[in-house]
């Protein structure tokens, strides 16, 4: 009788046989890696849009740049859509070809004003049909291969100068400005380190705000034993200005006005969370300091802590240091300082005519936005940088501090608690007025600049 081989042995032998089966190889045709000029143009527009959006450029400007590039190199029209973390380019190529859609995820990054200007000039040259597709691709590759950046020490020192300029703006002494510089240097380094390790923005802002407040309290405590005059209030205000200065609240309002609502909502929420982190950190720091017996001097909620010339010097230092912190060139620092001084003068002038500080700040921001849009191409410096630097001195650091100090010191049933909330609300209103004013100036300046450009081109053709 023939014994039956177990089934598992048959399966194992079958697997062994399959291992040594020699079947003819099938030569698969590989996909051609070369791209059509149309796809290369779409990729070029997508890369420029991705870089600009990651650095906070307004969505409408990015969409117009991308469409200008595709109109130059593509036969079929292209639709560009932005939703803060995603940019999409779609092209309908007719009934005989499949539609094309490209999408990229936007990873937020710190602004680099030299990189922004280089990309904007590239897009402008493409729209003017001054570059072939090959030349544009090569130029983009060179721009992104090695973007111009300042060293970390320069960036940290720029953060220190922002804090020192804030102290000078409010009439601080040279000693106070030196302490604020060191504090801003360390705070900028801590903020960058938290960003590198992936800490969420809210907690990064909170931790740095706590650090600034406690260092200010420690400086005030040490000054009592050393016989030095150190105003901890000004140190905290300089830290608040440093932390709030980098927020893109003007761009968020601009996106909302331009009807890019998803992008605007995301950016506005980011600004709210970052500002909330600063508020929470300062409140925690003030609470800890008061528990250890360190008292902060009361500061009048008026900008009369320094004479006019000193205020202008402080405003110029803040603006120049702010753009230096974002990798600006030297000429951009001079422009930003002059615009900030001019904007500060406008706000003082408006207040002299009887306007309150909220309205005066909005008027100054509107003038800054108008001047930035009108002169950005002439100076070859991004209007985003001019606006951001010009409005930094208008940041309501003093009002925000006084409101937070009142909330910490007085219980809810105290008669001084509601006035503290009112001061805090006014600080928020100043920030909103500055954002709306800068956006309004930007909107008004766009058609005026377009008319000037068209007039210049007509005169050039006639001559």
Indicate residue ranges for each PLM-predicted region.
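Alpha-helical membrane-inserting segments
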Residues: 165-166, 170, 186-195, 215-223, ...
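Core alpha-helical transmembrane segments of integral membrane proteins
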Residues: 148-251, 325-326, 330
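Hydrophobic, membrane-facing alpha-helical anchors
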Residues: 125-139, 154-165, 181-191, 286-294, ...
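Soluble N-terminal domains of membrane-associated systems
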Residues: 1-136, 142-144
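Generic multipass alpha-helical transmembrane bundles of integral membrane proteins
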Residues: 242-250, 266-355
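Membrane-interface helix termini and inter-helical loops of multi-pass transporters
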Residues: 224-231, 290-305, 409-421
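C-terminal transmembrane helix-loop-helix hairpin of multi-pass membrane proteins
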Residues: 235-240, 251-253, 259-275, 304-310, ...
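Central hydrophobic cores of alpha-helical transmembrane segments
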Residues: 182, 208-211, 334-342, 388-393
């Amino acid at each position: 009788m023939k014994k039956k081989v177990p089934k598992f042995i048959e399966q194992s032998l079958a697997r062994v046989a399959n291992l040594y089966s020699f079947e003819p190889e099938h030569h698969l045709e590989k996909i051609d890696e070369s791209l059509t000029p149309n796809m290369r143009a779409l990729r070029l527009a997508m890369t420029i849009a991705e870089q600009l959006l990651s650095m906070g450029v307004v969505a409408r400007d990015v969409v117009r740049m991308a469409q200008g590039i595709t109109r130059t190199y593509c036969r079929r029209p292209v639709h560009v859509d932005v939703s803060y973390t995603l940019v999409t380019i779609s092209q309908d190529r007719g009934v005989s070809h499949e539609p094309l859609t490209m999408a990229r995820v936007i990873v937020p990054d710190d602004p680099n004003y030299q990189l922004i200007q280089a990309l904007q000039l590239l897009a402008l040259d493409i729209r003017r049909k001054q570059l072939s597709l090959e030349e544009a691709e090569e130029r983009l590759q060179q721009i992104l291969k090695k973007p111009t950046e300042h060293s970390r020490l320069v960036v940290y020192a720029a953060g220190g100068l922002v804090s020192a300029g804030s102290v000078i703006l409010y009439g601080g002494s040279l000693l106070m400005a030196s302490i604020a510089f060191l504090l801003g240097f360390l705070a900028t380094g801590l903020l960058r380190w938290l960003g590198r390790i992936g800490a969420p923005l809210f907690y990064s802002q909170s931790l740095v705000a706590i650090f600034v407040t406690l260092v200010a309290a420690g400086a005030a405590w040490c000054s009592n034993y050393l016989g030095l005059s150190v105003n901890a209030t000004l140190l905290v205000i300089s830290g608040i200005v440093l932390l709030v200065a980098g927020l893109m609240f003007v761009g968020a309002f601009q996106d909302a006005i331009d009807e890019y609502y998803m992008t605007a909502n995301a950016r506005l929420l980011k600004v709210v969370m970052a500002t909330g982190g600063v508020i929470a950190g300062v409140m925690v720091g003030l609470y800890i300091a008061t528990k250890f017996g360190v008292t902060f001097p009361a500061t009048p909620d008026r900008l009369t802590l320094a004479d006019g010339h000193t205020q202008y010097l402080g405003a110029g230092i803040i603006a120049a240091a702010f753009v230096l912190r974002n990798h600006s060139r030297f000429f951009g620092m001079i422009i930003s300082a002059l615009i900030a001084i001019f904007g500060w003068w406008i706000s003082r002038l408006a207040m002299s005519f009887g306007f309150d500080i909220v309205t005066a700040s909005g008027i100054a921001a509107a003038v800054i936005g108008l001047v930035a849009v009108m002169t950005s191409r002439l100076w070859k410096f991004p209007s985003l940088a001019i606006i951001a630097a010009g409005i930094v001195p208008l940041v309501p650091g003093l009002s925000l501090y006084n409101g937070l100090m009142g909330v910490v010191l007085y219980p809810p049933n105290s008669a001084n608690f509601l006035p503290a909330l009112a001061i805090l609300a006014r600080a928020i209103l100043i920030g909103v007025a500055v954002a709306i004013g800068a956006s309004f100036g930007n909107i008004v300046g766009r058609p005026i600049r377009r008319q000037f450009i068209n007039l210049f081109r007509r005169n050039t053709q006639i001559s």
